[in-house]
Amino acid sequence: MHEMTDSENTPIQPVSGTVVPRFAGPSTFARLPEIRDVKSCDIAILGIPFDAGTSYRPGARFGPQAIRQASRHLRTQYHPSYDTEPFMEQQVADAGDITCNPFNILESVEQIQTAATEMLGNVKSIISLGGDHTIALPLLRAVNHH
């Protein structure tokens, strides 16, 4: 678990549905703040909008956006089945999307691997919101690097 320092006196929290309606506000995962520099986080949510590796059925590139939109309705305070408050126990932030070249699969694999490797140098875990099955290879390479 992330040890809080004096400068990190409060955990990163989603925007409350009682303050801003769930249909408004940030389009991030679970309405968490978007933080590109994730050094103070335990877990980074990382979008990988890529589907150039698919045949006949493109559209997986819209996955990260769709997951973020659906996650607006998550109730994030307390999970009774696990008796936990996930966003109080871990620092979680949405790190945005990796920019991928939709016209060059090899270049995109390198871009994903480089971004994930750099991010894993700063956080304990990445939760990837993706695209097609191609994204698994560079993510596994990044994990293997660490």
Where are each of the predicted segments found?
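Metal-dependent C-N hydrolase catalytic cores
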Residues: 2-146
